[in-house]
């Protein structure tokens, strides 16, 4: 028997040829889902200083913090159906850092993100993708660059991509709590960059 998750993915694949979802301005009661890992949880900052909490204050909308520390793209994909059941009107996908740290096959990360976008579209919800740095030993020295798979997937899937945000923040020692996590100021700056990006899309 086909599972609910597989049905959502299949529906999204069939819809993928319809092109990028049209973005509309979120109503006052609409929620945003922030899907991710420890960067979404806000690891390294006090409670309430995570980027979803700061984003909620900036845009006056409810933001569901769908982050779990240590999550890989496969684990985030497995959690996504339950998060979509909360009926968000926009999903921000910021995932993949733990895949890179664990040196998981890039092909698996790509496929998991494809499935996430397909599942989100099957729920008739627009998605935006956030580029994640390719964490290597260079990150310990403050040399941070984005993994190229995000730009490639954004082009392939026709999904808006926020570039440069995490790489800029995690490349600045004043905005980090450790080599791969932001501090309060870093999460605030990410939220500000995301707000600017969403405004350009006409979402907020």
What residues fall within each predicted segment?
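Serine-esterase "nucleophile elbow" of acetyl-processing enzymes
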Residues: 19-87
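N-terminal secretory signal peptides
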Residues: 1-2
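Alpha-helical cap/lid subdomain in secreted, periplasmic
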Residues: 58, 77-204
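N-terminal export signals
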Residues: 6-20
């Amino acid at each position: 028997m086909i599972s609910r998750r597989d049905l959502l993915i299949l529906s999204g694949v069939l819809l993928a040829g319809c092109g990028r979802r049209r973005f509309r301005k979120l109503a006052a009661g609409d929620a945003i889902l922030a899907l991710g890992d420890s960067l979404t949880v806000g690891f390294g900052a006090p409670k309430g200083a995570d980027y979803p909490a700061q984003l909620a204050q900036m845009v006056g909308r409810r933001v569901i913090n769908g982050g779990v520390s240590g999550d890989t793209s496969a684990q985030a994909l497995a959690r996504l159906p339950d998060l979509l059941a909360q009926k968000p009107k926009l999903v921000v996908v910021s995932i993949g850092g733990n895949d890179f740290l664990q040196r998981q096959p890039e092909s698996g990360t790509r496929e998991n993100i494809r499935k996430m976008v397909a599942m989100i579209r099957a729920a008739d919800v627009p998605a935006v993708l956030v580029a994640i740095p390719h964490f290597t030993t260079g990150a310990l020295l403050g040399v941070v660059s984005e993994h190229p798979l995000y730009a490639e997937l954004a082009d392939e899937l026709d999904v808006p991509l926020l570039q440069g945000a995490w790489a800029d923040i995690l490349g600045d020692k004043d905005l980090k709590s450790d080599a791969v996590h932001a501090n309060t100021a870093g999460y605030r700056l990410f939220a500000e960059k995301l707000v600017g990006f969403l405004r350009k899309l006409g979402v907020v």
